[in-house]
Design a protein with these regions (language model features):
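Short, conserved alpha-helical segments within structured domains
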Residues: 41-44, 97, 101, 163, ...
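Phosphate-backbone recognition surface of nucleic-acid-processing proteins
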Residues: 94-97, 103, 107-195, 199
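HhH-family (HhH-GPD) DNA N-glycosylase catalytic core used in base-excision repair
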Residues: 36-51, 117, 129, 141, ...
């Protein structure tokens, strides 16, 4: 039940995002600046629509607004049902203790992962979530002038390409929130930036940490402990 409710909620959220992007793209196609969220608000729509000079395009914008209203109306009950069903799974209460995970992400994590025992290690979860590093290596040793020598370190090609997109989005969003929300994760984020590490790499490390701690808390059924930040190195 939880898995299907999660799918329904995620589908609505994705459709809502697409409609919002299409709406802004329509305004931009007429060179109408539309930064921020003001363009979506009901109270300002008539003003925005008046900026479109062509009747056909203006009508298309009205239809996009209708889609936006419908999807926003559907999202709230879908969210409520997802949260209500997630309370039937006791682990969600423990996962909510993890900073930046929250009720919705905890519910989605349980729905998407199903059981933590499908992953023997955090690295398997990283790979499944699109947070694993792919390397390139043709062999550990090679011949140089007839002598066997150890090769140089393998090349890192980037993150793995075959993964669960919803789960990756969940952990990346949690990492983004953790980087701006006061707490232990933000402290780690600021310390890493002070060392000269790029923000994108620090957020990736945060996403991996959050995924690893999620797996540990779920497998052991224990409460979140801030000390896990020290032991769950990414």
């Amino acid at each position: 039940m939880l898995r299907e409710l999660a799918r329904s909620y995620l589908t609505i959220v994705k459709d809502l995002s697409r409609v919002m992007n299409r709406l802004k793209a329509l305004y931009r196609s007429w060179a109408i600046p539309c930064a921020g969220r003001d363009v979506y608000y009901t109270r300002h729509r008539s003003q925005w629509l008046e900026k479109i000079p062509e009747a056909g395009t203006r009508r298309r914008a009205e239809q996009l607004y209708q889609q936006l209203d419908m999807l926003q109306h559907l999202r709230q009950p879908a969210r409520r049902e997802l949260l209500a069903e997630s309370r039937q799974h006791t682990i969600t209460a423990k996962l909510r203790q993890i900073p930046s995970l929250g009720p919705i992400r905890s519910a989605l994590a349980v729905a998407l992962i199903q059981t933590p025992h499908r992953f023997r290690s955090k690295r398997q979860l990283w790979t499944y979530s699109g947070l694993g590093l792919e390397t390139r290596d043709s062999g550990e040793y090679h011949f140089v002038k007839g002598q066997v020598q150890r090769k140089k370190p393998v090349w890192i090609r980037g993150l793995n390409k075959d993964y669960n997109h919803d789960l990756k989005g969940l952990f990346k969003a949690a990492a983004m929130r953790a980087s701006i929300q006061p707490g232990p994760f933000q402290e780690f984020y600021q310390r890493s930036l002070a060392k000269g590490i790029k923000p994108t790499m620090v957020r990736l490390t945060l996403a991996r940490k959050i995924a690893a701690i999620t797996l540990t808390v779920w497998k052991k059924g224990e409460n979140f402990d801030v000390e896990k930040l020290k032991s769950q190195a990414a």
